[in-house]
Amino acid sequence: MASNPPLDLTLTPTKGDGRTLEQWFTTFHLVSVVVDPFTNESAWILDTAARILRDFAGAAVRVNWVVTGTAEDARAFLGPLASEFLTFADPDRSYVSALGLQHLPAFVFLRVDGQVVAVAEGWNASEWREVAEAIADTVVWSRAVIPAPGDPQAYVGTPALV
């Protein structure tokens, strides 16, 4: 079960200085895809997740990756996706732990007040679609098509905390 993270938790982008969640929330909700750069399960979802993040890029949300590794790990794992989207490094998994995530990859929607609105862990198209619908309803945006041709079959993912 996901939990609301503390607003004083610092998220550090791969480029730039870290800021607290409260500072990241000054204008936009956070829509994160959380991945582990050391697992196949997270690699399998990159194309699908990038497509979904692109669908919300123009909405009143801050779309981003959270990579459970260093900034270098994030850039190596995501390649050009690390530059296309805001990317946070979470090498000690403090953000993952604060959210109470059990499996990665995960799709997380946090409102500007820091409340978890919706979470999907592992890859299950219907669960990710529910998160996308919660985002679309909140910001009055078009719904992402999930699943789309080429998306992987459902899988549980890997343990979020190791």
PLM features: residue spans?
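Thioredoxin-like thiol-disulfide oxidoreductase module
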Residues: 68-104
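Conserved redox-active cysteine motifs that mediate thiol-disulfide chemistry
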Residues: 34-48
